[in-house]
Amino acid sequence: MTAPDSSSAPAPLAFGGKPRVYPMRLYGDPILRRKARNLTAADTLHVPGFEPQTVREVADTMLETMFEERGVGLAAPQIGLPVRMFVAVEYADDEEENEGQETPLRSRVLREYVMLNPVVKVINKKKDKSYQEGCLSIPGIYEDGVPRARQVRVDYTDLDGQPRSIEAEDYLARVFQHETDHLDGKLFLDHLPADITEDHRKDLLRIQQASKNFLAQLSEWDKAQRHLKENL
């Protein structure tokens, strides 16, 4: 999910080794419509295009990716991992402009969250439509009126493998619901009338083409790596 003041730009495309940030999976990528599987904190994860990493390493890189993309949350399917994991942050609301320069997002962080196998339970069923939503996988598209439960509890596992629970309301509750949706193959546009998605048809087609281009590059890189291994 994007921060309210976000102007996201794609991370540079570079495969191999341990990444500083991950390239973003975009609207149209089949992985964004898959239901993710559970994981444990002890798992080794393999983000396509990169070396295997621990769950903690992946979480750290996801946070770095999220900050670079000026987001407020990022789910594992958005980096090509079909596992039930997301990262999110709370930012300070009192951003001050300094001679026209954007305040670095990291300096505004109040709290970071890394959630494995999150389960959202609604506390207050009243729907809230007062916040604008966007998504790092659907860059440049924002909509008001996405209905979300006003208050939720999230039960999850932390990076040490311990069970945790947190209650959230208003915007943070929205973030947790948005990211958990990703783990079930849902996007925020799915909660809106079809004519709103149709209004964004031109932009969505452009994003889908960018997604196809990325997947083609990833496939070519993967073929090249397999060829190298076969000829060692």
Swiss-Prot record:
The active site is at residue 179. Binds 1 Fe(2+) ion. It catalyses: N-terminal N-formyl-L-methionyl-[peptide] + H2O = N-terminal L-methionyl-[peptide] + formate. One of its GO terms (molecular function) is peptide deformylase activity. Keywords: Hydrolase, Iron, Metal-binding, Protein biosynthesis. InterPro entries: Peptide_deformylase, Peptide_deformylase_sf. Fe cation binds at residues 135, 178, 182. Its EC number is 3.5.1.88. PANTHER family: PEPTIDE DEFORMYLASE (PTHR10458:SF22). This is Peptide deformylase. It comes from Deinococcus radiodurans (strain ATCC 13939 / DSM 20539 / JCM 16871 / CCUG 27074 / LMG 4051 / NBRC 15346 / NCIMB 9279 / VKM B-1422 / R1).
